[in-house]
Regions:
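Short terminal or interdomain "cap/linker" segment that borders an active site or interface and mediates
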Residues: 96-98, 106-109, 116-123, 160-178
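A conserved amphipathic terminal alpha-helix motif
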Residues: 139-171
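Short C-terminal domain-edge/linker segments immediately following a structured domain
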Residues: 34-36, 128-132, 154-162
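Hydrophobic-ligand binding "helix-grip"
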Residues: 72-118
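Glycine-rich loops and low-complexity Gly/Arg-rich segments
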Residues: 28-31, 114, 123-125, 149-154
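Short hydrophobic helices that act as membrane-entry/anchoring signals
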Residues: 35, 39-47, 137, 141-145, ...
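Hydrophobic ligand-binding cavity/cleft-lining segments
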Residues: 1-77
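Beta-strand/loop substructures that line and gate deep hydrophobic ligand-binding cavities in soluble
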Residues: 103-142
């Protein structure tokens, strides 16, 4: 679990706005060269080695978390704002959401939650629940761990901070009080 990410001017009901801003920011992101390079290499290797085929993903090698949820909870994913990132919605509530992906290396569930900090503020908390796929998945995750911790996670944190700051523009809203 990551430590919470505090954001200025947030309230108890801002989690859906945050999710929409994060998803909108994904399509307009400007990542550092190192991040772009790492993802380009990962997606190229995945294509060449068949890591990301439908058979290796959700509904193929891995049953989706959404399929194992109570129907009323699973249905909440239908109302989530679409996104072009590689994750699939599992569920979305007013203060938490889960998104997942699966491929030949892992089954990953990203949980985002909106939590009170005790001083009247709120923060975004993220947990990644990762189940490596066999020995190869464990070795792959061990190999990429330094890249995730030193390059990807700090860049992701900055991207999320920008998404909140730029939410009015990203969500094409003129009301700056969101």
């Amino acid at each position: 679990v990551w430590a919470g990410l505090p954001f200025p001017e947030v309230g108890a009901d801002d989690f859906p706005v945050m999710l929409d801003a994060l998803k909108a920011a994904y399509d307009t992101r400007k990542e550092p060269f190192a991040v772009r390079l790492l993802f380009a290499v990962r997606w190229k290797l995945g294509a060449l080695l068949g890591w990301d085929t439908p058979q290796a993903g959700l509904g193929g090698r891995v049953a989706s978390l959404r399929d194992r949820l109570p129907p009323d909870l699973a249905k909440t994913a239908d109302d989530a704002t679409p996104c072009t990132d590689p994750f699939t919605e599992a569920y979305q509530l007013g203060n938490e959401a889960a998104r997942e992906l699966a491929n030949k290396t892992v089954h990953d569930i990203m949980h985002l939650g909106w939590a009170a900090t005790g001083d009247g503020e709120y923060e975004l908390r993220m947990a990644a629940l990762v189940k490596p796929n066999g020995l190869f998945g464990r070795l792959y995750m061990a190999f990429i761990a330094p890249f995730r911790h030193l390059i990807i996670y700090p860049a992701l944190t900055r991207q999320w901070e920008r998404a909140w700051r730029d939410r009015a523009r990203l969500l094409d809203r003129t009301d700056r009080t969101i």
